[in-house]
Amino acid sequence: MKKAIILLTLVMCSSTMNAQWWGSKKVNGNGNMVTDTRNTSSYDEVTLVGSIDVQIIPGTEGKLKVEAESNLQEYILTEVKDGKLKISVEKDVSLNPSRNMTIRVTVPVETINSLYLTGSGDISNTGILKAKELKIGVTGSGDIDLNVEARELWGSITGSGDIRLNGKAQDFKCKVTGSGDFQVYASRSLKARVSGSGDISYKGNPEKQDFKTAGSGDISRN
């Protein structure tokens, strides 16, 4: 009897520890796709955390469109704090959409200063994203693919993610740490750094060029 109690206690402790380490809830999609419109305050920065697709479109800020299966909607968080929009999944919850279904959030912007992606999601846009100054960053394996016109651009990749920027920028500073790839355009100046096996390819003929590599990565004109 004592052995049985001890064994049961060990199993319960193990289950508790596993729940803490690996997340406590996995939710499978039910196949019923729905669209939820969410109202927020305005924002000039967008951060995506997790495996979600985000589409940036021109429009009035504060009216987001969230496309997902009905039983997943409640776990998708869209919060604005201090002018920063964060799109994420509820803590300790793992969402598993049905086959051929994805979670997509459409984000209208008037002006934007920063776009950040952490995880395996994707960020893209329709039209041309115009900004005087714009910061873009990927941490993880996600991808950012944008049409951009900016005076100054800063970009960074940490991990295996990719950033592809079509359009024009006068001055560009970019950095890759890891195995990610960067595709950029710069007309006046380009400062590029690669640490690891990642690559930076650029278009344009910037007058000022400052390149440094450490590792097997490469910086080249496309």
Task: Show where each model-derived region lies.
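Intrinsically disordered, low-complexity terminal regions
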Residues: 1-222
